[in-house]
Structures are given as C-alpha cells and as structure tokens.
Amino acid sequence: MEPQPLELEQVSGAYDPKNRILYVQYRGHITSEITTQVYAWISALISTYGLVPVQGSIFDFREVTNFVVGNLSTTQYQSYQLNNQVDLSDHPVALLVNNIYQRAMVKAALNVTPQQERKRIVHSMEGALAFIHDWHQINRQAG
C-alpha cells in the first residue's frame, strides 16, 4: 500500500517508491500552520510505514516567496519533537533552494534544528539525489 500524498495549496508531498525518496514541495508563503501540517504528515507516515524503505527526503523551497514570521520557531519545535520520537540520524535531507532569500531562510532553520550534518542545501534535483546517494555511501563505509 502506497503512502497517502499530502496535497494543500502551499505544499504537496509524496513518496517516490522508485528512488525511495520522500519529496515535499512548498509554494508561496510558508506559515507555521503549513509547517505543522507537513510534520504531522511525516510523523503519520513514519508511524504507519517506518523509515526503512526511505533513503532520504527532499524539501523543495524553489517556489517559496515568503517564510512568514513564526515559522522558524515552529520548524525548530516540530523538528525537535520528531527527532525525539524517531532516530533520524541515518536519514539524509536535501533542502532545494533557488535564490539567496530562500537559502538564507533555510540556513537559519538549519541552525536551530538538530543533526545538521545529515542535511544539506542544494540547488538542483540532481544535487539533491546525489547528496542522498553520497550520504549513504560515506556512512556505509564509516559504519
């Protein structure tokens, strides 16, 4: 059974079984409410399916025009909650951006969330997929 996709006006999310990637695409204004809904969806997916089949996640911010005030603290809180419920230490996350504003806002979120080394800002889908692949190659060799 395939995981249910997330479809809202400002965000969509789906699991790609071929690449084994969880893909979330944001659009327009990102609010605290949107962030909370995304984390609730991810938490429900993990509760139902676990993390084993998933190689990594790609969060695509390229169509975001505004990160609304309060979203940073919500991201920090939701990330902290999820990391306390589930061991995500072997789950790489690529954060896809298109411009300086998106990069600055995503970088600020990275600075307030745990396990930064498994997260990377990238500028293309190819870069996102390569980061996830390389993460597993490096960690397999180190482990």
Where on the chain are the PLM-derived regions?
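Amphipathic, Lys/Arg-enriched alpha-helical "gate/interface" segment within cytosolic domains
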Residues: 2-143
